[in-house]
Amino acid sequence: MAYDKQALIDQLGQLTIMELADLIDGLKETWGVTAAVAAGPAAAGPAAAAEEKTEFDVVLVDAGASKINVIKEIRAITGLGLKEAKDMSEKGGVLKEGISKDDAEKIKAQLEGAGAKVELK
């Protein structure tokens, strides 16, 4: 049985909504199907969230009230001179870049023990 697809589309386009609903119900009964929407693929979470970060930067946010102790810790951690460590304690910024999580947490604990506010990024 040959059919003209365009003629069929034109005929369906002339049907009212009620006639289309009856047609759909008739097709469901004849073929034994339901008009369920196919589910798309499940959206995966962001790749960055799935992977654990391996390199961290230790950032000094604030030296706190006991700047002398913080300066001593900065010198011990970075190997900077007294003036550079003092400047770092006043300005803040990145103390260490690209280090492991364990090392970053140790440094953070040292600096917080001295009274500084530190972030890991």
Curated annotation (Swiss-Prot):
GO terms for biological process: translation. The keyword Ribosomal protein applies. The keyword Ribosomal protein applies. One of its GO terms (cellular component) is cytosolic large ribosomal subunit. Keywords: Ribonucleoprotein, Ribosomal protein. One of its GO terms (molecular function) is structural constituent of ribosome. Gene3D superfamilies: 3.30.1390.10, Single helix bin. InterPro entries: Ribosomal_bL12 (IPR000206), Ribosomal_bL12_C (IPR013823), Ribosomal_bL12_C/ClpS-like (IPR014719), Ribosomal_bL12_oligo (IPR008932), Ribosomal_bL12_oligo_N_sf (IPR036235). SUPFAM superfamilies: ClpS-like (SSF54736), Ribosomal protein L7/12, oligomerisation (N-terminal) domain (SSF48300). Forms part of the ribosomal stalk which helps the ribosome interact with GTP-bound translation factors. Is thus essential for accurate translation. Homodimer. Part of the ribosomal stalk of the 50S ribosomal subunit. Forms a multimeric L10(L12)X complex, where L10 forms an elongated spine to which 2 to 4 L12 dimers bind in a sequential fashion. Binds GTP-bound translation factors. Belongs to the bacterial ribosomal protein bL12 family. HAMAP family: Ribosomal_bL12 (MF_00368). This is Large ribosomal subunit protein bL12.
